[in-house]
């Protein structure tokens, strides 16, 4: 199954790739040519692929996404809800890599 090519503006590319996820799990899968990014809830897989390829000048093999529901938390008797989040696990083609410790 191939993803269709999507044309997105330069500004939208920076909106889609919000931040890399720097965790122990993210660094472990980084050794296998995968990178994790926080993305907006409305971002699609083809948009994420186009944004990563455009910003980092790499070839993307696959994009997997996951949505996390925000937890309900109490603070001083007030009930609040954390925001829902979406992450994208981007698999890079052989020979390509992204150093997430440097800025774009």
From Swiss-Prot:
<dbReference type="InterPro" id="IPR012677">
    <property type="entry name" value="Nucleotide-bd_a/b_plait_sf"/>
</dbReference>
<comment type="similarity">
    <text>Belongs to the universal ribosomal protein uL23 family.</text>
</comment>
<dbReference type="InterPro" id="IPR012678">
    <property type="entry name" value="Ribosomal_uL23/eL15/eS24_sf"/>
</dbReference>
<keyword id="KW-0689">Ribosomal protein</keyword>
<dbReference type="GO" id="GO:0019843">
    <property type="term" value="F:rRNA binding"/>
</dbReference>
<keyword id="KW-0687">Ribonucleoprotein</keyword>
<keyword id="KW-0699">rRNA-binding</keyword>
<keyword id="KW-0694">RNA-binding</keyword>
<comment type="function">
    <text>One of the early assembly proteins it binds 23S rRNA. One of the proteins that surrounds the polypeptide exit tunnel on the outside of the ribosome. Forms the main docking site for trigger factor binding to the ribosome.</text>
</comment>
<dbReference type="InterPro" id="IPR013025">
    <property type="entry name" value="Ribosomal_uL23-like"/>
</dbReference>
<comment type="subunit">
    <text>Part of the 50S ribosomal subunit. Contacts protein L29, and trigger factor when it is bound to the ribosome.</text>
</comment>
<protein>
    <recommendedName>
        <fullName>Large ribosomal subunit protein uL23</fullName>
    </recommendedName>
</protein>
<dbReference type="Pfam" id="PF00276">
    <property type="entry name" value="Ribosomal_L23"/>
</dbReference>
<dbReference type="GO" id="GO:0006412">
    <property type="term" value="P:translation"/>
</dbReference>
<dbReference type="InterPro" id="IPR001014">
    <property type="entry name" value="Ribosomal_uL23_CS"/>
</dbReference>
<dbReference type="GO" id="GO:1990904">
    <property type="term" value="C:ribonucleoprotein complex"/>
</dbReference>
<dbReference type="GO" id="GO:0003735">
    <property type="term" value="F:structural constituent of ribosome"/>
</dbReference>
<dbReference type="GO" id="GO:0005840">
    <property type="term" value="C:ribosome"/>
</dbReference>
């Amino acid at each position: 199954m191939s993803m269709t090519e999507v044309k997105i503006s330069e500004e939208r590319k920076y909106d889609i790739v919000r931040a890399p996820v720097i965790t122990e799990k993210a660094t472990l899968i980084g050794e296998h040519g995968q990178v994790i990014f926080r993305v907006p809830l409305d971002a699609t897989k083809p948009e994420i692929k186009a944004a990563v390829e455009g910003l980092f000048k790499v070839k993307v093999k696959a994009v997997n996404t996951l949505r996390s529901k925000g937890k309900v938390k109490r603070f001083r008797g007030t009930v609040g809800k954390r925001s829902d989040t979406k992450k994208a696990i981007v698999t890079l083609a052989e020979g390509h890599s992204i150093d997430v410790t440097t800025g774009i």
